[in-house]
Amino acid sequence: MASTLPTTWPHESVKFEDVSLRFTEEEWALLDRQQKCLYREIMMENLNNMISVEHHFSKANVMPQLEEVEDCWPMQREIPQDTLPECSGHSLDPEMNSFPAESPLMKIKVVEVLTLNKDMAGPRNALIQSLYPESGEDLNPGNLKPAQQPSKHLTDTEASRQKFRHFQYEESAGPQKSVSQLRKLCHQWLQPSTRSKKQILELLVLEQFLNALPEKLRVWVESQHPEDCKAVVALLENMTSVSKDDAWLACSSEATDELKEKRKDVATLPVTVPPEAPVTFQDVAVDFSQEEWQLLGPMQRTKYHDVMLETLGNLVSVGWEPTLGNRELTPDSPIPVVKPIHDPNPKDLSRNRTQSTLFESISPDEVQGRHTIESNPVGLLQEKGHPQQKLSESSKSQNQTCIDKSQCSLNEVLPRNHVKVKQKGTGKGKGRTNTISMTGGLRIRNQQKDSVEWRDRSGSTPVTHGSSIKNQQLGSEQGKTQTSRDPITLTVPAEFYQEATGSEEGRFRNSSNAMAADAPPKIHQKGPEWHKAGKSNNSMLQGSSAQNHQMGSRAGRARDNSILTHVKIHQKGYKEGKIQGNNNYLKHVKPHRKGSKEERLRELSTCQKHVPYVKQHLKTSGRGKGRKINASIKCGPYIKTYYRGSDVGRLRRANNCRKAISRHAQQISFIKIHKGSQVCQCSECGKMFRNARYFSVHKKIHTGERPYMCMSCGKAFVQSSSLTQHLRIHSGERPFECSECGRTFSDRSAASQHLRTHTGAKPYQCQHCGKAFRQSSHLTRHVRIHTGERPYVCTKCGKAFTQSSNLIGHQKTHRKKFKKQPKL
């Protein structure tokens, strides 16, 4: 505290009692430790002022005043006795201990005792430290520096501010005590007794300004301990060359080595001029080894594919000539295609949205031992005009891949359509190019010689296997081409194609059997298992539905009429011994010609030649609606007939046949409860349904019909939704995520059941006792306790159980008994 000495002095001597402040015992007990320390500092400042004006007073007059704050000096008893030899001993004589004016050093020693020693004084007693001599000079009143204001205790001030800002009201303390505590904390923070209003205002502005700074910047500024707003402004102005990462490292004592290395690399990165040589795709491409590629998951591979396509689009957009001629794909290099995580639904994609480009995954293990693609296998060029002509020209130049430059941009990525497989010919020197769709088509039919069409799911691009590719829209006539979107082809050796698809040379030839909707080319791995009908065109695999089989072009629908021809044999019957249908089926019809009408019908049921899922085919083709159709359809061990005007379908057993004779799919036997009502009842089990649509699914339980089959494991399902859910097991897709904990599920119902564990909802309540459950299966199991139902019966001892798990455990006891029996 700097001040000028007065020129005139009062005649009366100033005593220490005149400038000291005393507390009673009750008042002193109410003060906390910080307030007592503040009192000590003020007393020390008054003492220093008295010494600076050459006031003479004895130690006995000073010590009683400062003994009250003895608890603030825990180290006073450890001060060496030689610090003040004149004051050794407990009994101090006032006359012996008076401080003469000619001995300023004695005054300093007294001050030293009061401030716990020079080394212990620290920044809290900067005022006392200023009284010590510099360079060993003796002190005199002229050499003493004016008193300075004690330094601000930033640590204590910050702690007080934090306590004041985070003060919480306690009901047990009461409002009056809480207000007094808050006022005390505010005084400790702002210190109105020692600070002016301007300084207090500066503290408030400083606090608000620090809170307004970004988090990392605020932490760094607080680590510098600025005293006022000017210091903060100076720090921020000097930060023009300091990044936020540097600021974070400056305030963090545990910075990671990785971040330090990154900072070093960024700092030492030389500023170079971009090269004048053209940028190639290899400069921006990222390659993975076989081991690295196997460690990537499906999502990471999809991300890698998207990033590479985006990089390619950037290069094409700036006029780069996209060629990969000098890059050879070897068995050691990963195939830059990724496995599709899900098949994109075209209905969910708008015109302006980017369509997902998901490729069939080819692991590096499948590439082992296969031939290397030629040195210049893949090229990119812009196709204009006639696609067929351009494609034929491109096939002469190493089968280049065609991309429409207008379609290739950062906002839209071309979808995968098919893989072109080049196979070297052996006859006249001409090779054959096999093209396979990678999107999952709807069907394959014989379009021309050595050509099989696999239509894209979106209907935009059909894919042809053979010597030519023709773009046909779904439902359009044959020959009508489409140029809105050009295909993407990838050249692959024929040996790799044959091993990947499991098909031999000519497997696609003369094949008009329809394929499943979601089946990739791997459907041919099953071999003859999927062609049980041999060369017959009467069998059709059920993919999404037989309706997709009828959505093709008119020419394909006209050609593939063998199924209808077979149905006509049974549908129209025999008219006076004349056979209605194709002459190729004379041998098939002759066994049914003899006998009466009932006998012919009975023999007709023994027909072993069948057409799976004919009723779905007829439903989509529009034929047979509203009339009776007795077709040999594989429906189970029963024969169902339905006559117009009858209320209940007649059910009778076929003794020698596993086939059934039934009406159209929409006219299967059921009982309507009320006329005009949608509520119906199954004629076999009596189960009620709110709508005939639900009954159409239920009836497959009795008939054993499972039209939706998994192409990976061969498991069949009644509903398409069940197949979709099952396919997620093979693909690993888990699209349903819990919003509470982030856990993912492959089934929507499983996600909803899991969510009930967070919400505590129990929607399934027992009508007998009122107990609620989270899952319907738990309720079904509980109801058996009330009803006494025991559906699970042991076949060996006849004991019944309410749960299947109990039955399984019981059956193990029989096995143990059988093992314990001694051998004879």
Curated annotation (Swiss-Prot):
<comment type="subunit">
    <text>Interacts with NGFR/p75(NTR).</text>
</comment>
<keyword id="KW-0238">DNA-binding</keyword>
<keyword id="KW-0805">Transcription regulation</keyword>
<feature type="domain" description="KRAB 2">
    <location>
        <begin position="279"/>
        <end position="359"/>
    </location>
</feature>
<dbReference type="GO" id="GO:0006915">
    <property type="term" value="P:apoptotic process"/>
</dbReference>
<feature type="zinc finger region" description="C2H2-type 4">
    <location>
        <begin position="764"/>
        <end position="786"/>
    </location>
</feature>
<feature type="zinc finger region" description="C2H2-type 5">
    <location>
        <begin position="792"/>
        <end position="814"/>
    </location>
</feature>
<keyword id="KW-0963">Cytoplasm</keyword>
<keyword id="KW-0677">Repeat</keyword>
<feature type="compositionally biased region" description="Basic residues">
    <location>
        <begin position="418"/>
        <end position="431"/>
    </location>
</feature>
<feature type="zinc finger region" description="C2H2-type 2">
    <location>
        <begin position="708"/>
        <end position="730"/>
    </location>
</feature>
<keyword id="KW-0863">Zinc-finger</keyword>
<dbReference type="GO" id="GO:0043565">
    <property type="term" value="F:sequence-specific DNA binding"/>
</dbReference>
<keyword id="KW-0053">Apoptosis</keyword>
<keyword id="KW-0678">Repressor</keyword>
<feature type="cross-link" description="Glycyl lysine isopeptide (Lys-Gly) (interchain with G-Cter in ubiquitin)">
    <location>
        <position position="15"/>
    </location>
</feature>
<feature type="compositionally biased region" description="Basic and acidic residues">
    <location>
        <begin position="447"/>
        <end position="458"/>
    </location>
</feature>
<feature type="zinc finger region" description="C2H2-type 1">
    <location>
        <begin position="680"/>
        <end position="702"/>
    </location>
</feature>
<keyword id="KW-0832">Ubl conjugation</keyword>
<feature type="domain" description="KRAB 1">
    <location>
        <begin position="14"/>
        <end position="85"/>
    </location>
</feature>
<feature type="region of interest" description="Disordered">
    <location>
        <begin position="418"/>
        <end position="560"/>
    </location>
</feature>
<comment type="function">
    <text>Transcription regulator which may participate in NGFR/p75(NTR)-mediated apoptosis. Probably acts as a transcription repressor: specifically binds to the 3'-end of zinc-finger coding genes and recruiting chromatin-modifying proteins such as SETDB1 and TRIM28/KAP1, leading to transcription repression.</text>
</comment>
<feature type="region of interest" description="Disordered">
    <location>
        <begin position="383"/>
        <end position="402"/>
    </location>
</feature>
<feature type="compositionally biased region" description="Polar residues">
    <location>
        <begin position="535"/>
        <end position="551"/>
    </location>
</feature>
<feature type="compositionally biased region" description="Polar residues">
    <location>
        <begin position="459"/>
        <end position="486"/>
    </location>
</feature>
<dbReference type="GO" id="GO:0008270">
    <property type="term" value="F:zinc ion binding"/>
</dbReference>
<keyword id="KW-0862">Zinc</keyword>
<comment type="similarity">
    <text>Belongs to the krueppel C2H2-type zinc-finger protein family.</text>
</comment>
<dbReference type="InterPro" id="IPR038269">
    <property type="entry name" value="SCAN_sf"/>
</dbReference>
<keyword id="KW-0804">Transcription</keyword>
<dbReference type="Pfam" id="PF02023">
    <property type="entry name" value="SCAN"/>
</dbReference>
<feature type="compositionally biased region" description="Polar residues">
    <location>
        <begin position="389"/>
        <end position="402"/>
    </location>
</feature>
<dbReference type="GO" id="GO:0051726">
    <property type="term" value="P:regulation of cell cycle"/>
</dbReference>
<dbReference type="GO" id="GO:0005737">
    <property type="term" value="C:cytoplasm"/>
</dbReference>
<dbReference type="GO" id="GO:0006355">
    <property type="term" value="P:regulation of DNA-templated transcription"/>
</dbReference>
<feature type="region of interest" description="Disordered">
    <location>
        <begin position="137"/>
        <end position="159"/>
    </location>
</feature>
<feature type="zinc finger region" description="C2H2-type 3">
    <location>
        <begin position="736"/>
        <end position="758"/>
    </location>
</feature>
<protein>
    <recommendedName>
        <fullName>Neurotrophin receptor-interacting factor 2</fullName>
    </recommendedName>
</protein>
<feature type="domain" description="SCAN box">
    <location>
        <begin position="161"/>
        <end position="243"/>
    </location>
</feature>
<dbReference type="InterPro" id="IPR001909">
    <property type="entry name" value="KRAB"/>
</dbReference>
<dbReference type="GO" id="GO:0005634">
    <property type="term" value="C:nucleus"/>
</dbReference>
<keyword id="KW-0479">Metal-binding</keyword>
